[in-house]
Amino acid sequence: MPPVPNDKPFTLAGRTYQSRLLVGTGKYKDLEETRAAIEASGAEIVTVAVRRTNIGQNPGEPNLLDVISPERYTILPNTAGCFTAEDAVRTCRLARELLDGHKLVKLEVLADQKTLFPNVIETLKAAEVLIKDGFDVMVYTSDDPIIARQLAEMGCIAVMPLAGLIGTGLGICNPYNLRIILEEATVPVLVDAGVGTASDATIAMELGCEAVLMNSAIAHAQNPVLMAEAMKYAIEAGRLAYLAGRMPKKLYASASSPLDGLIR
């Protein structure tokens, strides 16, 4: 998106990005579709599930980094599939080893397989260890404003509350909690999980989120590459609308044209 005079840059760990759309790499039919969708999205940050995707830990198997180059994209390793703080910390350390000292990670510690809700207790434990270990932690969490505040205060560089359950496409289920998190935010707030279509992404940005991370909404679309492009423009439209400031809602009608000087 071209720079807007009254906008502030989207910055993570000291690096500024033009795109406010972050995308995942799972659930595509093959690596070529993955590559094409990510390119169409315009995203600069690509998140990778270290426990599910080969980024060098399995020599001889197809390597995602052969099609998603770390020279072009910021690779964001994530801890999807981890259900304890210990597993999440171990996974982040593996990613750092595989990516030559890479410090930026997305922490997620899940509570159970059915809901994939974040386990906030284990998340807090893992975040504390990772921050002390020198990682730049972006953290997937619930939409509880108190937990979001605690994660920011302990040193997470971005807080990523869910908009809906992972992979459901339900959209922004609780915009009111998100608004409270955004009002109190001292670090970037990104919606993570729940987005189903372009309008959901736009709503998240209109609320004031710095960015949106998504995977299923693109990968599960009938045409993932086309949906990726739609999301690119949805994010831009939402950001512009947020900066422009929407008109206030009113109970009664208000004519667009003044009544003075009517032809009679």
From Swiss-Prot:
One of its GO terms (molecular function) is thiazole synthase activity. 1-deoxy-D-xylulose 5-phosphate binds at residues 167, 193-194, 215-216. It comes from the Bacteria. GO terms for cellular component: cytoplasm. Its EC number is 2.8.1.10. GO terms for biological process: thiamine diphosphate biosynthetic process. It is an enzyme of class 2 (transferase). Signal peptide: none annotated. It catalyses: [ThiS sulfur-carrier protein]-C-terminal-Gly-aminoethanethioate + 2-iminoacetate + 1-deoxy-D-xylulose 5-phosphate = [ThiS sulfur-carrier protein]-C-terminal Gly-Gly + 2-[(2R,5Z)-2-carboxy-4-methylthiazol-5(2H)-ylidene]ethyl phosphate + 2 H2O + H(+). Pathway: Cofactor biosynthesis; thiamine diphosphate biosynthesis. It is found in: Cytoplasm. The active site is at 106 (schiff-base intermediate with dxp). Keywords: Cytoplasm, Schiff base, Thiamine biosynthesis, Transferase. CDD domains: ThiG. InterPro entries: Aldolase_TIM (IPR013785), Thiazole_synthase_ThiG (IPR033983), ThiG (IPR008867). PANTHER family: THIAZOLE SYNTHASE. Belongs to the ThiG family. Homotetramer. Forms heterodimers with either ThiH or ThiS. Catalyzes the rearrangement of 1-deoxy-D-xylulose 5-phosphate (DXP) to produce the thiazole phosphate moiety of thiamine. Sulfur is provided by the thiocarboxylate moiety of the carrier protein ThiS. In vitro, sulfur can be provided by H(2)S. This is Thiazole synthase. It comes from Stutzerimonas stutzeri (strain A1501).
